[in-house]
C-alpha cells in the first residue's frame, strides 16, 4: 500500500498529494557529502530509504547487493569513473538494466541535458535541487514519468 504525503508549497498554500511506493529505495551516487546529506534528508522526509556511494566505479557491484532498488540518482562528475561510464555498466548488468537512472548535476545546461538523454539517462535534475519541487519530481520519477528539469 503506498504512502501519501500532502506537502504545502509557496505563498498560495497549494496542496497536492504525492503517492510513493511503500519501502522505496534510492541509491544516491554523489561525491559531495553536503549534497548527499541534502538529498538524503529530502528523501527521508518522503519516507524513502536511501543508500549512498561516492564514485561511479562502486555503483554496479554495490547496487547488485541491494534487495530492492527503485531509482538511482547519479551525479555526472564523479571521481575515478564519471556518471556516463557508470551508466553504461549499470545498463549492462541484467538485474539493474531497467532501474531508472537520473542524472543530478550542477552542470545544468541544455547541452548537458541533451548529452544525458543521448547517453541513456532516464531523467535530469539540475543542481541546486529545489526542496519545494523535489518531492513531486521524485514521485513522478518513481511512477515512471521522465523528469528533465534544469533546477
What are these regions (language model features)?
Residues 1-27, 31, 132-151:
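Non-catalytic signal-transmission and effector/linker regions of two-component phosphorelay proteins
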Residues 32-36:
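Short acidic/polar segment at the start of the alpha1 helix of CheY-like receiver
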Residues 37-45:
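Charged docking surfaces used in two-component/phosphorelay signaling
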Residues 52-71:
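Acidic, metal-coordinating helix/loop segments flanking the phosphotransfer/catalytic sites
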Residues 75, 105:
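Active-site residues of response regulator receiver
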Residues 79, 97, 109:
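The feature encodes the CheY-like receiver
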Residues 127:
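A Lys-centered signature of the CheY-like receiver
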Amino acid at each position: 500500500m503506498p504512502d501519501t504525503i500532502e506537502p504545502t508549497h509557496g505563498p498560495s498554500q497549494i496542496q497536492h498529494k504525492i503517492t510513493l511506493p511503500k519501502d522505496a529505495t534510492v541509491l544516491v551516487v554523489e561525491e559531495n557529502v553536503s549534497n548527499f546529506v541534502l538529498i538524503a534528508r529530502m528523501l527521508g522526509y518522503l519516507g524513502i530509504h536511501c543508500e549512498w556511494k561516492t564514485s561511479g566505479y562502486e555503483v554496479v557491484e554495490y547496487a547488485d547487493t541491494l534487495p530492492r532498488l527503485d531509482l538511482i540518482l547519479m551525479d555526472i562528475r564523479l571521481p575515478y569513473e564519471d556518471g556516463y561510464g557508470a551508466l553504461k555498466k549499470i545498463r549492462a548488468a541484467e538485474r539493474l538494466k531497467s532501474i531508472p537512472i537520473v542524472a543530478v548535476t550542477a552542470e545544468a545546461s541544455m547541452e548537458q541535458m541533451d548529452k544525458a538523454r543521448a547517453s541513456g539517462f532516464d531523467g535530469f535534475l539540475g543542481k541546486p535541487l529545489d526542496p519545494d519541487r523535489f518531492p513531486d519530481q521524485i514521485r513522478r520519477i518513481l511512477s515512471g514519468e521522465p523528469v528533465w528539469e534544469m533546477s
